[in-house]
């Protein structure tokens, strides 16, 4: 355990940051799963409503990823990689293979 005041403060700050990081990552993963689920739903039954759902969920996931990068929860390359995964999945569903 910490013996001096600054070390105790660092422990408190690290715990606070850990909880913040955990909530950001959890909500980001949830939004990504919703986007992938919306893509699956659209591929099963294409329609305007399903397409709007895919685009809305992708927009929400992108926003959360960008905020996580801005706050420092994710590295910018990791954020770009996650956004690329989402974009590829959405593109695969919305644009039929030619």
Curated annotation (Swiss-Prot):
GO biological process, one term: translation
GO cellular component: cytosol; small ribosomal subunit
Gene3D superfamilies according to UniProt: Ribosomal protein S20
Pfam hit, one: Ribosomal_S20p
Highest taxon listed in the record's lineage: Bacteria
Keyword rRNA-binding: yes
GO molecular function: small ribosomal subunit rRNA binding; structural constituent of ribosome
Record-linked InterPro entries: Ribosomal_bS20, Ribosomal_bS20_sf
UniProt keyword annotations, A-Z: Ribonucleoprotein, Ribosomal protein, RNA-binding, rRNA-binding
Cleavable signal peptide: none
PANTHER family referenced in this protein's UniProt entry, alphabetically: 30S RIBOSOMAL PROTEIN S20 (PTHR33398), SMALL RIBOSOMAL SUBUNIT PROTEIN BS20C (PTHR33398:SF1)
Biological function: Binds directly to 16S ribosomal RNA.
Similarity comment: family membership: Belongs to the bacterial ribosomal protein bS20 family.
Protein name (database record): Small ribosomal subunit protein bS20
Source organism of the structure: Synechococcus sp. (strain CC9605)
Species classification: Bacteria, Bacillati, Cyanobacteriota, Cyanophyceae, Synechococcales
Name of the gene this protein is made from: rpsT
């Amino acid at each position: 355990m910490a013996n001096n005041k600054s070390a105790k403060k660092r422990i408190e700050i690290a715990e606070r940051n850990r909880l913040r990081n955990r909530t950001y990552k959890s909500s980001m993963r949830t939004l990504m799963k919703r986007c992938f689920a919306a893509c699956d739903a659209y591929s099963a039954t294409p329609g305007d409503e399903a397409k709007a759902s895919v685009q809305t969920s992708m927009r929400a996931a992108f926003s959360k990823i960008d905020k996580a990068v801005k706050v420092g929860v994710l590295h910018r390359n990791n954020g770009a990689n996650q956004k690329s995964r989402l974009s590829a999945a959405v593109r695969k569903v919305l644009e039929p293979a030619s």
